[in-house]
Amino acid sequence: GCPWDPWC
């Protein structure tokens, strides 16, 4: 996931 969005 992304640092700002765990669902990326």
UniProtKB/Swiss-Prot annotation:
Disulfide bonds join C2-C8. InterPro entries: Contryphan_CS. The keyword Secreted applies. These peptides are not hydroxylated and not amidated, and no D-amino acid are detected. Keywords: Disulfide bond, Ion channel impairing toxin, Neurotoxin, Secreted, Toxin. It comes from the Eukaryota. Signal peptide: none annotated. It is found in: Secreted. Its main location: secreted. GO terms for cellular component: extracellular region. GO terms for molecular function: ion channel regulator activity; toxin activity. Expressed by the venom duct. The cysteine framework is C-C. Its target is unknown, but this toxin may modulate voltage-activated calcium channels (Cav) or calcium-dependent potassium channels (KCa). Belongs to the O2 superfamily. Contryphan family. This is Contryphan-Fic.
